[in-house]
């Protein structure tokens, strides 16, 4: 099955040491193409699939003003940041069908590349508003998974998904500022998408009688 998905994202950053008054960055540019291969686990459980894809979207963070002090925090003089990324997720999917609905749970990993960056802050040098520093990592990878449901009208499916993307690649080298006090910045994003998926081969389910027969043969073997 081949699908095209479009959606919005809410991007934030996990900082260590901690930062405060963070606000999510809202973007409307998430697009992905996915290929789904349905298969049986252990040769007998039909509720699984492999999902491979190619996607582009946004990572980032933003600091809001502290209402009590009027101070706005920053990270390396940056108060707002958007990073354009391209990624390739690979996930296992568990799905349960209840015609015409399909309920899905996905979990896996992704690898990607931070293509470009746009950031701002009153103390930020103009040199770094749209370029990466030497100690900032552009290779991206991590966990990706989520929940969703679909409306199935063979040979077309309409998918709605909520996905979490948690990067395991810090935005910067941890010891860039000090060899004794490490700093980390891990992107954490939530995407809400809608997609149109097309069956590449004819979709055929099994009747209850066929499923019972298959289960019987697994337990007791085929009749002579």
Task: Give the predicted meaning of each segment.
Residues 36-45, 97-101, 152-156, 199-203:
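Outer-membrane beta-barrel channels and translocator barrels
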Residues 1-40, 197-199, 220-224:
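Short glycine/proline- and aromatic-enriched beta-strand/turn motifs that initiate or cap beta-hairpins
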Residues 11-26, 59-85, 112-140, 144, ...:
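Extracellular/periplasm-exposed beta-strand and loop segments of Gram-negative cell-envelope proteins
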Residues 140, 145-224:
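Predominantly the C-terminal beta-signal and adjacent terminal strand-loop region
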Residues 4-8, 31-37, 54-56, 88-96, ...:
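Residues on the lipid-exposed face of transmembrane beta-strands in outer-membrane beta-barrel proteins
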Residues 47-61:
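Early exported N-terminus immediately downstream of N-terminal targeting peptides
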Residues 1-2, 44-50, 99-105, 154-158, ...:
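Outer-envelope beta-barrel architecture signal
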Residues 26-30, 45-49, 83-89, 100-104, ...:
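Short connector loops at helix/strand junctions that flank enzyme active sites
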């Amino acid at each position: 099955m081949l699908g095209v998905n479009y959606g919005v994202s809410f991007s934030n950053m996990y900082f260590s040491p901690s930062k405060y008054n963070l606000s999510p960055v809202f973007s409307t540019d998430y697009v992905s193409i996915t290929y789904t291969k349905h298969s049986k686990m252990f040769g007998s459980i039909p509720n699984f699939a492999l999902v491979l894809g190619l996607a582009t979207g946004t990572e980032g963070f933003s600091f809001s003003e502290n209402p009590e002090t009027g101070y706005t925090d920053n990270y390396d003089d940056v108060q707002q940041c958007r990073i354009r990324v391209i990624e390739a997720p690979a996930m296992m999917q568990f799905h349960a069908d209840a015609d015409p609905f399909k309920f899905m749970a996905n979990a896996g990993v992704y690898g990607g590349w931070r293509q470009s960056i746009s950031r701002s802050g009153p103390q930020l040098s103009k040199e770094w508003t749209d370029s990466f520093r030497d100690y900032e990592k552009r290779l991206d990878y991590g966990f990706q998974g989520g929940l969703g449901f679909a409306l199935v009208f063979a040979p077309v499916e309409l998918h709605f998904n909520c996905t979490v993307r948690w990067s395991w690649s810090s935005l910067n080298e941890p010891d860039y500022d000090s060899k004794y006090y490490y700093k980390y910045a891990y992107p954490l994003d939530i995407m809400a998408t809608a997609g149109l998926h097309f069956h590449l081969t004819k979709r055929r389910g099994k009747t209850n009688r066929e499923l019972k027969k298959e289960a019987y043969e697994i337990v007791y073997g085929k009749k002579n």
